[in-house]
Curated annotation (Swiss-Prot):
Organism: Legionella pneumophila (strain Lens)
Name of this chain's protein: Na(+)/H(+) antiporter NhaA
Record's subcellular location: Cell inner membrane
Membrane topology value: Multi-pass membrane protein
UniProt family annotation: Belongs to the NhaA Na(+)/H(+) (TC 2.A.33) antiporter family.
Record gene name: nhaA
InterPro entries: Na/H_antiporter_dom_sf, NhaA
Length: 384
C-alpha cells in the first residue's frame, strides 16, 4: 500500500470515528446523563513545572492542548505536499487555492448577511468557512471506486488550502490581548527550533522539548495555542526518503485519527435538543452557519471550479462530469470539527450562551451538506 492509499484509508476510518463520537455526544446530551457529561468536561486539570502552573478544565485541555497536536499534523502535511506532493507542482496550485478562497468568501458573506446588525454575533463570521477533511474524505470513501481518484485529490487540495485559511483567520481575528513577554519567549523558542534544523539536529525528542516550551509561551501570549503546532511543523526537517517529517507525521497520524479528533468531536458536539423550537432554528447565528455551510460552500466551490478552463480539461481527461463536481462542492460544506473549533474561539470571551446555537448550526448544516453531497455523487457516479 502506497502513502496515498494509506492516507485515504486512515481518513476514511477517521471520518467514521468522528461520526460515531459526534452521535454519541448528541445522544448523551439529550439523556439523563447530560449532567455527568458537562461535569466531566468541566473537571480542572493542572500541570506544574517548578513555579509554572497551568490549570484548565478538561474541555480546554482538549481544545488548546490536543488540538495543537492536530494543527502540528496539519502543518506537517502542508509542508510535505508543498515539498513533494500535490502542491509541489505550481500549476496545480491555482485551481484549489482560488476555489478554497471562493469557498471561504461565500459562506462568510451569508453569515454576515444574517448577523450584520448584531456586533457580538458577527464575531462568528468565520465559523461556516471551514471544511473537515476527515469527515469529507470519510463520506467520499463510502462510495468506493465510484468517485474518480482525481476528484479525491482535488478535494484534499481544497481542504489543505482551507486549513491554511483557517490558520490565518485564527491568527488574525481570534487573538486575545497580547503579552509581549510571552511573544518574545515564543520567538526565542521558534529561533531555537529553526537553529536545530539548520545545524542538522534530527532527534524528534529535542524538537518536541522546545516545541512544548513554544506551546506554553504561545498559550500565555494571547495568540491561540494551536498555532504553535503550525510553527513547530514548519521547522521540522524534511530531507531524504525517511525524513524526520515523514517519521513524525506517520507517528502522529494514528493518534490524531483514533484519539484526538474523536475526543474533540465528543467534547464539542453535545447539542441538546431539549426545548428546541422554531425560534432557535431561525436564530441569526444558526441560519448564518447552517446556510453558510450548505449554500455558501457549494456556491463558492462549484461556481469557481466551473469557471476554470484548465479544470474543464481536467474533467475531460478523467471522465469526470459536472454533477460529480457539484457533489464534491456539497460535501465541502461539512465543516464539523473545524467549524466547532472556530466557534469556540469566536464567542469564548463574549457570549458563551451562543455556543448551543453554534453547535445546532454546525450539526444541521454539515449533516444536510454531507447527506445531499453523498446522494448526488451516488446517483451521478457509475461503478468503476
Amino acid at each position: 500500500m502506497n502513502k496515498s492509499d494509506s492516507f485515504y484509508n486512515l481518513e476514511t476510518i477517521g471520518g467514521i470515528l468522528l461520526f460515531i463520537a459526534a452521535v454519541l455526544a448528541i445522544i448523551i446530551a439529550n439523556s439523563p446523563y447530560r449532567i455527568g457529561y458537562d461535569y466531566f468536561l468541566s473537571i480542572n486539570g493542572s500541570v506544574s513545572v517548578g513555579n509554572l502552573s497551568i490549570t484548565k478544565p478538561l474541555l480546554l485541555w482538549i481544545n488548546d492542548g490536543l488540538m495543537a497536536i492536530y494543527f502540528l499534523l496539519i502543518g506537517l502535511e502542508i509542508k510535505r505536499e508543498v515539498n513533494r506532493g500535490i502542491l509541489s507542482d505550481k500549476t496545480n496550485l491555482l485551481v484549489p487555492a482560488l476555489t478554497a478562497l471562493a469557498g471561504l468568501l461565500f459562506p462568510a458573506l451569508i453569515f454576515i448577511f444574517f448577523n450584520a446588525h448584531h456586533p457580538v454575533y458577527l464575531k462568528g463570521w468565520a465559523i461556516p468557512t471551514a471544511t473537515d477533511i476527515a469527515f469529507t474524505l470519510g463520506i467520499v470513501s463510502l462510495l468506493g471506486s465510484r468517485v474518480p481518484f482525481s476528484l479525491k485529490i482535488l478535494l484534499t487540495a481544497i481542504a489543505i488550502f482551507d486549513d491554511i485559511a483557517a490558520i490565518v483567520i485564527i491568527a488574525l481575528f481570534y487573538t486575545e490581548q497580547l503579552s509581549l513577554l510571552s511573544l518574545s519567549l515564543a520567538l526565542v523558542f521558534t529561533l531555537i527550533l529553526i537553529g536545530l534544523n539548520y545545524f542538522k539536529c534530527r532527534r524528534i525528542s529535542v524538537f518536541m522539548l522546545f516545541g512544548v516550551a513554544l506551546w506554553i509561551a504561545v498559550l500565555k501570549s494571547g495568540v491561540h495555542a494551536t498555532l504553535a503546532g503550525i510553527v513547530i511543523a514548519m521547522t521540522i526537517p524534511d530531507e531524504g526518503k525517511e525524513s524526520m517529517l515523514t517519521r513524525l507525521e506517520d507517528g502522529l497520524h494514528h493518534w490524531v485519527v483514533f484519539l484526538i479528533l474523536p475526543l474533540f468531536a465528543f467534547a464539542n458536539a453535545g447539542v441538546s435538543f431539549v426545548g428546541l423550537d422554531a425560534s432557535m432554528l431561525t436564530h441569526p447565528v444558526v441560519l448564518g452557519i447552517g446556510l453558510g455551510l450548505f449554500l455558501g460552500k457549494q456556491l463558492g466551490i462549484f461556481l469557481s471550479l466551473g469557471y476554470f478552463v484548465q479544470f474543464k480539461k481536467f474533467l475531460k481527461a478523467d471522465k469526470v462530469n459536472l454533477a460529480q463536481v457539484y457533489g464534491i462542492a456539497l460535501i465541502c460544506g461539512v465543516g464539523f470539527t473545524m467549524s466547532l473549533f472556530i466557534g469556540s474561539l469566536a464567542y469564548q470571551n463574549y457570549d458563551l450562551s451562543l455556543m448551543p446555537m453554534v453547535k445546532i448550526g454546525v450539526v444541521f448544516g454539515s449533516f444536510i451538506a454531507g447527506l445531499t453531497g453523498f446522494l448526488v455523487l451516488k446517483m451521478t457516479s457509475l461503478k468503476r
